[in-house]
Amino acid sequence: MPILDTPYASLDLIRQPEQPNEPLQAFDAADEYLLATLHGQGLPAATRVLILNDSFGALACALAAHVEVTSSGDSHLAHLALQKNLARNDLPADRVRFVPASEAAQGPFDRVLIRVPKTLSLLEEQLIRLHDQLAPGAQVIAAAMIKHLPRAAGDLLEQYIGPVQASLAVKKARLLSATPVDKPAPQSPYPTRYQLDQPKLELLNHANLFCREGLDIGTRAFLPHLPKALGAIRVADLGCGNGVLGIVYALGNPQAELTLVDESYMAVQSARENWQVILGERPADIRAGDGLAEQPPGSLDLVLCNPPFHQQQVVGDFLAWRMFTQAKAALTKGGELWIVGNRHLGYHLKLKRLFGNAEQVAATPKFVVLRSIKA
């Protein structure tokens, strides 16, 4: 793997989830540009640094031995990458404090370093939280590859922080430096809510949720065809988002034992709050995790899944394939995986290869609902 050479450290970094013959590296030119700029400015050892959305820990690992670092983001996989990369580079784990994006970091901070996320509502929520977290003279710097830097990111920095200065481009990366000014305390528009018609439910969604303003069309295609199995079976909603699949299934099967898991901390927080409002004190295991990686083998009877096909800006079916293989391992003999996916992604071929069978349960012009049974 390529080495990240910075003025602070040379780092051997890996991505998460790990893939054989990984074609992508765990850092980019925006990380390099940001670290070089910080070094040029000077960074005293007493500097309190907050890093937001550090995908695989490149920024935190580079600075860990030099300043006080807090890292915050919405990805459990990013947190896992940070832990592994600290260990891989012989850096003490306690040099970096990690705070899930579902919680507020505790300032004040002298420098805030932001990797601009794909979802600008997440960036907006993070900037709103900075209102009372900045020390006098603090500086906020956002970094991105130019192809992933929308104009709206600069507008949000100016709206919530202060005047923005854009850097020159270096290796197709750009920095946006914002100078904090006094502003009235902003009101967050998050979480948002939408109404579900069948069944009639109101669902809450924190800032980084996919299809935050309404039910996504894949889930809409899946809900009428959820399995009708009843009784005390063990069911997982894999990649649960706001929990809608697991919650609707649980309403139809009062005896089922539910696990809802997602790698997004804000998704898990949304699912917990929705479960509490709709199902009250009914027990459920709702957690952030690397899919079903920590689920005991043979411990589930049914897995429901609407798999993602991107990780940040990277598009591919590697996450779906990983979820399918995890589901197979976690299912008991005769257990079933039910998924919904875009027709063009060809998930039926992957499921048939993995399980030896794949049945089309339902279809729309764009989506298919598929079922595979573990032999």
UniProtKB/Swiss-Prot annotation:
Gene3D superfamilies assigned: Vaccinia Virus protein VP39
InterPro entries recorded: DNA_methylase_N6_adenine_CS, rRNA_m2G-MeTrfase_RlmG, RsmC/RlmG, SAM-dependent_MTases_sf, Small_mtfrase_dom
EC number, UniProt record: 2.1.1.174
Location(s), subcellular: Cytoplasm
GO CC annotations on file: cytoplasm
MF annotations from Gene Ontology: 23S rRNA (guanine(1835)-N(2))-methyltransferase activity; nucleic acid binding
Keywords: Cytoplasm, Methyltransferase, rRNA processing, S-adenosyl-L-methionine, Transferase
Catalytic reactions on record: guanosine(1835) in 23S rRNA + S-adenosyl-L-methionine = N(2)-methylguanosine(1835) in 23S rRNA + S-adenosyl-L-homocysteine + H(+)
Domain of life: Bacteria
Chief localization: cytoplasm
Xref: SUPFAM superfamilies: S-adenosyl-L-methionine-dependent methyltransferases (SSF53335)
Role summary: Specifically methylates the guanine in position 1835 (m2G1835) of 23S rRNA.
Record-stated family: Belongs to the methyltransferase superfamily. RlmG family.
Name listed for the protein in its UniProt record: Ribosomal RNA large subunit methyltransferase G
Species the sequence originates in: Stutzerimonas stutzeri (strain A1501)
Source taxonomy: Bacteria, Pseudomonadati, Pseudomonadota, Gammaproteobacteria, Pseudomonadales
Gene field: rlmG
